[in-house]
């Protein structure tokens, strides 16, 4: 869950620009990894994932952005527990897609309404279930990239989802090959994808942008260090940042990098 922790810290810590960190209230639920997180308004939501006793979770908690306090919110419906899902937000509604539970790779999509504190089912992805897919949002649509499928192979598929029509559309495949556990975000009119693993478990350091207007991917300067997975990628004040992750030696990383778009280069923070 490194990218969730990174997002929480940077969302609430005004001293980030001095390159310092602040400790926040600990997560009140059971310890877990492979969870999802998203931000609605000023509040941060964290849920799903895998517990220390290898049980998929469906509970969710909200951190109040004003006072930093946690409280439980509606869990996903019974039987919908999962790990390695992907989450995104469109028009103050959160969505949780896919993942893995009890040997099954999932292709379902769930919508969370924070006003009603209610989960509702959306149309399933019209393709194989997958875990560890990446997602970003552009122009009111979500884009789901890659993921690991039941045959243990990663995927290069890209799908867009329109919540207005509750419909899925295939897009140009990811040119970096089959990938899962990548990091993704959007900034202005482009989506971005960094890191991940392929079906041979090779760790990747490639970096791409995606333009939805022409349905086209463009290679950007690769990350200047060995590849990783489980990392964070986010946009803040017109800049892109990447943090944390896991490398090929199974080591957890704590570094923070900035992508300088003007000079097309990576800078350690």
Describe each region flagged by the PLM:
Residues 18-269:
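Kelch-like beta-propeller repeat domains
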Residues 13-14:
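N-terminal signal peptide c-region/cleavage motif recognized by signal peptidases
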Residues 1-10:
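Sec-dependent signal peptide recognition
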């Amino acid at each position: 869950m490194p990218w969730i922790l990174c997002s929480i810290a940077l969302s609430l810590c005004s001293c980030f620009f001095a390159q310092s960190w602040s400790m926040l209230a600990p997560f009140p639920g059971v310890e877990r990894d492979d969870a999802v997180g998203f931000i609605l308004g000023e509040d941060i939501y964290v849920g799903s994932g895998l517990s220390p006793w290898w049980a998929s979770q469906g509970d969710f908690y909200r951190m109040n952005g004003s006072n930093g306090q946690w409280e439980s919110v509606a869990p996903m419906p019974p039987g919908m527990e999962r790990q390695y899902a992907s989450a995104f937000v469109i028009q103050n509604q959160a969505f949780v897609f896919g993942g893995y539970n009890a040997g099954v790779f999932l292709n379902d999509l769930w919508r969370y309404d924070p006003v009603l504190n209610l989960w509702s089912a959306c149309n399933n992805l019209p393709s194989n279930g997958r875990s560890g897919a990446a997602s970003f949002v552009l122009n009111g649509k979500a884009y789901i990239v890659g993921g690991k499928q039941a045959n243990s192979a990663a995927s290069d598929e890209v799908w867009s989802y329109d919540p207005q029509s509750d419909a899925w559309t295939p897009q140009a495949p990811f040119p970096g090959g089959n990938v899962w556990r990548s990091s993704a975000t959007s900034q202005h009119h482009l989506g971005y994808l960094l890191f991940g693993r392929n079906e041979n478990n090779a760790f990747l350091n490639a970096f791409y942008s995606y333009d939805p207007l022409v349905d086209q991917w463009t290679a950007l300067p690769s990350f200047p260090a060995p590849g990783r997975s489980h990392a964070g990628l986010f946009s803040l004040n017109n800049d892109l940042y990447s943090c944390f992750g896991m490398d090929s030696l199974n080591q957890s990383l704590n570094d923070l990098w900035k992508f300088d778009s003007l000079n097309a280069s990576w800078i350690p923070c």
